[in-house]
């Protein structure tokens, strides 16, 4: 490349250099000088013109680094996005944020619906007939079936109370994956952190309807506040959310039971507060987030593991299980033993089922939408029924959807390109670690070892579980969801009893967040990316391999690095972050850093946070 010739008042720039730079400079030089023509040899600009460009404000004058750092830095990008998506009005979109991820996910969602509708026009085999039945059930108003399930719920509850069978009730709830996230005893199956090829039962914390759990103590704190505090915006907002939550519970009661007071809103609210109090217990020393408990020791923590496991479906009770908190387990089990049959707790037990049943009933869905999506998340419009049905379809037919989506949209050229890019970026990452000045020799050695073994999985997860052909109904979504959940629970139990290999039942590719009602597993048709420390793997789903995240047409390596390159480096960096560094190169729970390494890492991270907070 030739040298740029510089004179006191004039700068000469080669045409090819100008072409490279003009995409970076906000306004091309030619607009400032008002020249009519750009010659092939040079483009003449004065120093004064360059100074004008540098001094020109690139944001609204009211936006400064001190009052709005994010918008100051990203002003042009945000402006371009608004222009790009201006055709999507608030009345048309059903998602909260307008960005490349949501726009692309909406595109993929519609492609999935199209795939389903094309198949069910003329189903050719049993699976396609089952797909048709389930899809129809998820978009059909089934009030008669809903009331049948509601009646059955009361019969089931009364039976457990009559038999004084707390552990049977808890087992019954935990068989239902859609409901158990609200249960005080929350069971799941997870990888054994000390042996990635084994699974273990985990007893953990529940989740709550309100994301900000401090709101459950609102009525305890309110009397202690001054008038000045009550006039603050934060107090008024908290009060609004709490009242809307109580109204939401009351609306469900009124819609389902009329004037009968079956579910008392304050009873549900107070039970959840009692559960939160149990989380604050601190009587047991040496507690951790990964406790192993032998079945003969479970009674020490007021937990009847043997009875609970049998209620789940175990024929032979496992000898050991994992617990997120011994303090919580001990306190919440005592709370349950003393109170589970009281009227207050009956409101809670009915509520946790009705909450989920209403979401999958078209006649009732507006009630949970108003609180969970509109008020808490700001979603402007209900999700279209066919798009919402994809949650249930992904749950019950993930293998089918994955197969059909891959057949239609797999791009081998993109897959190979991303793999090669990943390999090159790993080399750069290893070079950075090699040149690192603050890691200990131990930390540096383990980091390089981990990067040598990190893998990339592109497109679709390996060993996706085939969809069972169960006896689904075409007019009862709740029945179908529960039927599949029971089947899945049985398979998870088989993982623990060594009847099947973990590789045969990889449920990682079909996880649903039932609290948020969104796909959070590694489905190939979600627009996201992942790093999993237990297998030391980066995963890029097929749905991510499309515009704007990757395109190989005339936009250059800079564009590719900004999108898919940035995604790959972001995910691979998780292998060495605060959480990823807890696992070795083979995915086993083992620190790869020394204590000094971790202290230095934390200090650097905090310094970066402070730097941003200074300007924010």
Model-based region annotation:
Residues 45, 89, 268, 295-298, ...:
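Intrinsically disordered, low-complexity linker/terminal regions across diverse proteins
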Residues 77-80, 276-285, 454-465, 575:
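Secretory-pathway/luminal and periplasmic proteins that interact with or process carbohydrate-rich
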Residues 105-425, 461, 473-474, 478-479, ...:
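Noncatalytic, helix-rich "gating/capping" subdomain that lines the substrate-entry/channel surface
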Residues 1-8, 12-45:
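Compositionally biased low-complexity segments enriched in polar/charged residues
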């Amino acid at each position: 490349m030739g040298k740029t010739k510089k004179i006191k008042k004039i700068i000469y720039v080669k045409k090819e250099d100008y072409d490279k730079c003009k995409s970076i400079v906000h306004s091309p030089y030619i607009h400032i000088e008002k020249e009519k023509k750009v010659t092939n040899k040079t483009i003449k600009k004065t120093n004064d013109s360059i100074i004008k460009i540098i001094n020109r404000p690139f944001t609204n004058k009211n936006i400064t680094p001190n009052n709005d750092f994010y918008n100051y830095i990203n002003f042009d990008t945000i402006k371009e996005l608004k222009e790009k998506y201006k055709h999507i009005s608030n009345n048309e979109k059903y998602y909260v944020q307008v960005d490349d991820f949501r726009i692309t996910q909406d595109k993929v969602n519609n492609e999935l619906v199209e795939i389903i509708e094309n198949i069910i026009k003329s189903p050719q085999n049993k699976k396609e007939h089952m797909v048709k039945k389930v899809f129809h059930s998820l978009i059909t108003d089934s009030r008669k079936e809903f009331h049948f399930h509601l009646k059955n719920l009361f019969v089931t509850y009364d039976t457990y109370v009559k038999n004084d069978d707390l552990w049977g009730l808890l087992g019954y709830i935990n068989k239902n994956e859609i409901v158990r996230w609200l249960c005080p005893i929350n069971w799941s199956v997870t990888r054994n952190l000390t042996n990635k090829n084994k699974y273990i039962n985990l007893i953990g914390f529940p989740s709550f309807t309100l994301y900000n759990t401090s709101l459950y103590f609102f009525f305890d704190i309110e009397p202690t506040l001054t008038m000045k505090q009550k006039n603050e915006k934060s107090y008024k907002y908290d009060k609004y959310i709490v009242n809307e939550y109580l109204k939401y519970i009351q609306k469900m009661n009124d819609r389902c039971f009329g004037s009968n007071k079956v579910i008392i809103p304050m009873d549900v609210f107070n039970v959840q507060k009692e559960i939160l109090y149990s989380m604050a217990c601190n009587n047991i020393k040496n507690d951790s987030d990964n406790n192993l408990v032998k079945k003969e020791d479970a009674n020490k923590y007021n937990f009847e593991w043997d009875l609970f496991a049998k209620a789940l479906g175990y024929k032979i009770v496992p000898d050991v299980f994992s617990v997120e908190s011994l303090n919580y387990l001990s306190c919440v089990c005592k709370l349950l033993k003393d109170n589970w049959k009281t009227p207050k707790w009956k409101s809670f037990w009915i509520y946790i089922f009705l909450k989920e049943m209403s979401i999958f009933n078209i006649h009732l869905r507006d009630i949970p939408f108003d609180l969970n999506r509109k008020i808490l998340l700001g979603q402007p419009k209900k999700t279209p029924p066919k798009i919402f049905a994809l949650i249930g379809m992904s749950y019950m037919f993930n293998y089918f959807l994955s197969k059909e989506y891959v057949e239609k949209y797999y791009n081998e050229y993109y897959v190979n390109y991303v793999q090669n890019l990943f390999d090159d970026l790993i080399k750069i990452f290893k070079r950075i670690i090699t040149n690192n000045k603050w890691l200990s020799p131990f930390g540096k050695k383990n980091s390089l070892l981990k990067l040598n073994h990190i893998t990339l999985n592109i497109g679709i997860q390996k060993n996706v579980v085939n969809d069972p052909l169960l006896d689904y109904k075409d007019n009862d979504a709740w029945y179908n969801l529960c039927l599949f959940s029971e089947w899945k629970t049985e398979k998870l139990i088989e993982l623990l009893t060594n009847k099947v290999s973990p590789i045969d039942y990889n449920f990682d590719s079909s996880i649903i967040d039932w609290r948020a009602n969104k796909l959070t597993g590694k489905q190939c048709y979600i627009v996201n990316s992942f790093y999993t420390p237990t297998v030391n793997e980066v995963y890029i789903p097929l749905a991510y391999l499309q515009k704007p995240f990757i395109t190989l047409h005339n936009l250059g390596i800079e564009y590719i690095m900004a999108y898919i390159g940035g995604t790959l480096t972001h995910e691979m960096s998780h292998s060495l972050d605060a959480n990823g560094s807890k696992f070795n190169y083979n995915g086993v729970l083992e620190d790869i850093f020394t204590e000094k390494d971790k202290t230095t890492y934390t200090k650097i991270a905090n310094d970066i946070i402070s730097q941003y907070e200074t300007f924010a």
